[in-house]
A protein has these predicted regions:
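All-alpha prenyltransferase/terpene-synthase fold signal
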Residues: 1-358
Length: 358
């Protein structure tokens, strides 16, 4: 952990700080229970796929809702793919592929912690099934962005994109069914967040087509794909109740935008090309300097994280999981710092510059 934040994490680990202990507790729970979640996800998805007697209608409705026919199957493709995915082993493979995501790995322990903190603050009766449904539902909703991104980007899992197209409507329905267990307001907040995220996703796709004319405002709008989903999920871990709901919304939304910057740096290293669209691309083109572009991206990542940390100042006195959130934001800081440091070490500036869109 050769970053400033990494050294702070190590120090907290050595001294077993409260934040470290809480974070470790939820990380261990994630590692233990994740296989159960993946199995549950697969089986419930399988039930929906098998029970659907009108998969073509399901595809069309999903395409209308998300505003794109590019992410649904042609009617002639549906039956053979549906038949293939009705094999539990095949479906489980696809589920595990889309769950192999940094966002999922980072959010699972966080949502459980936020739900527990809310339960304690509001003196709710402990309800393990409600906790499972609310956390599962939002993880599944967030995970929907993985296959949708892969379908649009066509940069990984090329052999499975049609399978993902069939799965997407059922993933969304499963998420909705679980989130609805939290009540009308919780579902309403999710729907609003999902709608905003679709706006961000649409802009993301649009900006790919004219990448040299990206504006700061457009790129900020496209980041709704991060902040709307994560912010809404944060708020809903408190069942959309104040004051925690608003603090969780801002904190999780801004932290996810910070992670988004780190992810763009990571992807640029992997592809040896600046991600399109992204903050590194916007800044590289506007300054005519790729190094400066990534430097400014790090500054933006820090700005997002500072906003997330400011939200913690609004937490109630004696809030049980304050130290957890402070430690969490330290890990977010380390993520971006780690990939920025790796970028400097890789020294691929000439590749990045030569592949900039003209």
């Amino acid at each position: 952990m050769g970053t400033k934040s990494g050294k702070k994490i190590i120090k907290q680990g050595l001294f077993k700080s409260k934040g470290y202990r809480q974070f470790n507790q939820y990380k261990e729970e994630y590692e233990t229970k994740f296989p159960e979640f993946a199995k549950r996800f697969t089986n419930q998805l399988l039930e929906q796929i098998k029970a659907d007697s009108s998969p073509n209608v399901t595809q069309q409705k999903f395409g209308e809702e998300v505003g794109s026919t590019d992410i649904i199957l042609e009617s002639s493709q549906i039956d053979p793919i549906k038949s293939k995915l009705e094999n539990v082993d095949v479906l489980n493979d696809r589920v595990l592929r889309i769950l192999n995501s940094n966002f999922v790995k980072m959010t699972f322990p966080v949502f459980n912690a936020l739900f527990d903190a809310s339960t304690e603050y509001f003196h709710d009766n402990k309800d393990p099934k409600l906790r499972e449904d609310i956390v599962d539902g939002h993880i599944i909703a967030i995970d929907l962005s993985e296959p949708m991104d892969r379908i649009v980007d066509k940069d990984e899992d090329l052999d499975y994109l049609d399978d993902y197209k069939l799965m997407n409507p059922y993933i969304l329905k499963l998420a909705r069914d679980k989130i609805a267990k939290g009540g009308e307001e919780v579902l309403k907040q999710f729907e609003n967040g999902f709608k905003d995220a679709r706006v961000g996703q649409y802009l993301d796709t649009k900006l790919k087509q004219n990448s040299t004319a990206i504006t700061e405002k457009e790129l900020d709008e496209s980041y709704k794909k991060y902040r709307s989903v994560m912010g809404t999920a944060g708020s809903n871990m408190a069942l959309s109740r104040q004051p925690l709901g608003e603090v969780f919304r801002i904190g999780m939304g801004k932290a996810s935008e910070s992670v988004g910057c780190g992810n763009e740096i990571e992807d640029s290293i992997r592809d040896k090309a600046v991600k399109i669209p992204s903050w590194p691309l916007y800044y590289s083109l506007s300054t005519n300097d790729v190094r400066k572009g990534f430097e400014l991206t790090m500054e933006r990542s820090e700005m997002y994280l500072n906003d997330a940390r400011k939200a913690l100042e609004r937490l109630p006195e004696n809030f049980s999981h304050r130290a957890f959130l402070e430690f969490l934001f330290l890990t977010v800081e380390h993520y971006s710092e780690f990939w920025y440091k790796r970028l400097q070490k890789e020294n691929i500036w000439s590749d990045l510059t030569s592949k900039l869109p003209k």
